[in-house]
A protein has these predicted regions:
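N-terminal export and membrane-targeting signals
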Residues: 1-8
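Extended, solvent-exposed, non-transmembrane regions
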Residues: 10-198
Length: 198
């Protein structure tokens, strides 16, 4: 098992609506979300640093440093995503939980990007290159940078690998973008209070 520093081990997982093309950029909400998965198996991995601009829950502008992880293709087993909306009138906090990818049919994503703030996982990378100029990763095994209005330095630090396997994944993220995202066995639930995936 190869353990790479946290920026290298960032898992590209999350829940998002299926999209036909990659969004260049968007303002992130004032809420990060948590994701867990038993396993992620991906091909064509790339990663680099960026800034996500967005808002607080009070509407003030803010920004978040993130590690953007990208996969050309990824299969995710037993995925859970949770987000908590705090301080709603009368009822207080409400938790939204989404689960998918169980019963032998993993979640499948193509051209997947996830903007991650924190990650815990065991990770194994195959044929990894660390220290690649981020803008040059478009010529590597992964999808490279998003482009568009993204706030990232194409001459900055990047890394790429032919494949990656991550197990026992726990992460906090601000955004996910995917070309396609198939959520097998999707179940959504709402509950009062704080009930997160971890």
């Amino acid at each position: 098992m190869v353990m790479v520093p946290s920026v290298a081990a960032t898992a590209a997982i999350g829940v998002a609506l299926a999209q036909g093309a990659l969004a260049a950029s968007f303002s992130v909400s004032g809420q990060s979300f948590k994701v867990t998965a038993d396993k992620l198996e991906g091909t064509g991995f790339s990663q680099y640093g960026a800034i996500d601009s967005g808002y607080t829950l009070k509407g003030e502008k803010t920004a978040h440093p993130v590690a953007v992880s990208a996969f050309s293709s990824a299969d995710i087993t037993n995925m859970c995503q949770s987000v908590v909306t705090p301080d709603l009138p009368i009822i207080g906090s409400v938790s939204l939980t989404l689960k998918a990818g169980g019963k032998g049919t993993p979640v499948h994503a193509e051209n997947l990007y996830i903007d991650v703030e924190d990650l815990q996982a065991d990770a194994t990378f195959t044929n990894i290159d660390i220290g690649v100029a981020a803008g040059d990763m478009k010529n590597g095994p992964g999808p490279g940078m998003k482009g568009g209005k993204e706030t990232a330095n194409k001459y900055g630090f990047g890394q790429q690998a032919e494949s990656a396997v991550l197990t026992d994944v726990k992460q906090t993220a601000w955004a996910t973008t995917a070309g396609t995202f198939k959520l097998s066995g999707l179940k959504m639930s709402l509950s009062k209070g704080v009930k997160e995936c971890y």
